[in-house]
């Protein structure tokens, strides 16, 4: 087998591979002999079938099999001999072959770039943090109590107003026809909550206890029941009672109703939950800033094929969002050429950062353990309460799905490793500042 490098351009390499005719013939003969040992043909004992008959019956399929294997072997040998690090599967094209002649094929391959990661200790990252104050815990308790609210009778009769709870019977129709789910009795509705069709609650403001009202509304265009989208509906409504909402009392009994020993224990749990949530958001902001700094300090070439794959995924997602009306309003105003240029730059950034994180992980022996993969599977199952068994079964029967969890775990471990190397400073901010999109302050930044 002869391997000749024919082109070297950036990360792209091209080779010409020649497999001698006698090697092809030997491979074919060996494969036919293997078949002859097991194949059953009437009139012949296994292993005694004439080679001529084997060639007649199986020669064509065996030749195809041998050529495919020869190409695979030749490609692998080219990679090994030239110490290549392919970024993607090499592209192979058979350029010459006739029965009894040499096999010639070309192989084009893009390589992973060789580069030196920057000195991480020279990179500065600011991490926004939130201190959970007692007042924040108080607000959290009040929100929980509001969700546990009851209602109390009016001290004096008056018309319903926003914020009141009205007890109603209602019966709706569309185009004069009754529809399922449009009738209810003794339903408690908080006016102004937005829990009913837009406009419904507004038309009950000012109603008195015992009053009957006809309410006309229009279902939103994006209503979940497509047959009702954009339709006008008429509801006959009887206001049976008007009550005022009453938040639950925040006391020891309130805490015990949630399974806590006392109110202090509930406050501690709320504080810990807040601290965990804000710590997660804080890490996300630090990670984003780190990736921005890494993108600024690294500009090595990246394989075009990898960028093409990443761009295609982004572009398909964008096209679906545009179709569903969920795309960024700014994207809707841009021409296709401008959008493609913008998102190709994002694709290139993502590929470069991915290669950088992979190299940092490789150099520092960062790996993903079986236990970490198992914990990730458990976390996925917890996202689907009541369906945990089905989730576990899915991952058990689909090992490739488990492997799909490896990349994000690896990325997080490498990011945490780098954050431990950089000059990391913390800055105390408000909850509003922590939640604010950094692009609002820093201008557009291509997401990693």
From Swiss-Prot:
PPIase FKBP-type domain span: 163-248
Enzyme class: isomerase
Listed EC numbers: 5.2.1.8
Location relative to the cell: Cytoplasm
GO molecular function, one term: protein folding chaperone
Keyword Cytoplasm listed: yes
Chief place where the protein resides: cytoplasm
InterPro entries xrefs: PPIase_dom_sf, PPIase_FKBP_dom, Trig_fac, Trigger_fac_C, Trigger_fac_C_sf, Trigger_fac_ribosome-bd_bac, Trigger_fac_ribosome-bd_sf, Trigger_fact/SurA_dom_sf
Record keyword Cell cycle present: yes
Domain of life (superkingdom): Bacteria
Keywords: Cell cycle, Cell division, Chaperone, Cytoplasm, Isomerase, Rotamase
A single Gene Ontology CC term: cytoplasm
Catalytic reactions on record: [protein]-peptidylproline (omega=180) = [protein]-peptidylproline (omega=0)
Gene Ontology BP annotations: 'de novo' cotranslational protein folding; cell division; chaperone-mediated protein folding; protein transport; protein unfolding
Coiled coil: none
Record-linked NCBIfam families: tig (TIGR00115)
Domain notes: Consists of 3 domains; the N-terminus binds the ribosome, the middle domain has PPIase activity, while the C-terminus has intrinsic chaperone activity on its own.
Family classification: Belongs to the FKBP-type PPIase family. Tig subfamily.
Function field: Involved in protein export. Acts as a chaperone by maintaining the newly synthesized protein in an open conformation. Functions as a peptidyl-prolyl cis-trans isomerase.
Name this protein carries in UniProt: Trigger factor
